[in-house]
Amino acid sequence: MQKIVIVANGAPYGSESLFNSLRLAIALREQESNLDLRLFLMSDAVTAGLRGQKPGEGYNIQQMLEILTAQNVPVKLCKTCTDGRGISTLPLIDGVEIGTLVELAQWTLSADKVLTF
């Protein structure tokens, strides 16, 4: 089984970096169901994990994350990044968890590929 880690840094809206990382993650799962895929959000991307955001038009990051978590893709938010933004205690999208750099390091060491957005 191939192991891929996607690390995303961009804000959920205003930049398409996170959007494109999620598009790729969903496409990878559609192409290969026997894939160990993991998603780690850092920097401004951690705000994507907050429940109840209502974008005006276009894509919906919460829906994209829910698609991935429904497929048992682990989605973690950098604890240092959430602490720095004061959002660590706010409600998260179901299936999204706070993670640590140690976890990301472990994921990276066991991965076949690490993709960064």
Curated annotation (Swiss-Prot):
Gene Ontology MF terms in the entry: identical protein binding
Protein's name in the database: Protein YchN
Family from the record: To M.jannaschii MJ0989.
Gene responsible for this protein: ychN
InterPro entries, per database record: DsrEFH-like (IPR027396), Sulphur_relay_DsrE/F-like (IPR003787)
Top-level lineage group: Bacteria
Taxonomic lineage: Bacteria, Pseudomonadati, Pseudomonadota, Gammaproteobacteria, Enterobacterales
Subunit structure comment from the entry: Homohexamer. The hexamer is formed by a dimer of trimers.
Any single GO CC term annotated in Swiss-Prot or TrEMBL for this entry: cytosol
PANTHER family cross-referenced by the UniProt entry: PROTEIN YCHN
One protein family per Pfam: DsrE
Gene source species: Escherichia coli (strain K12)
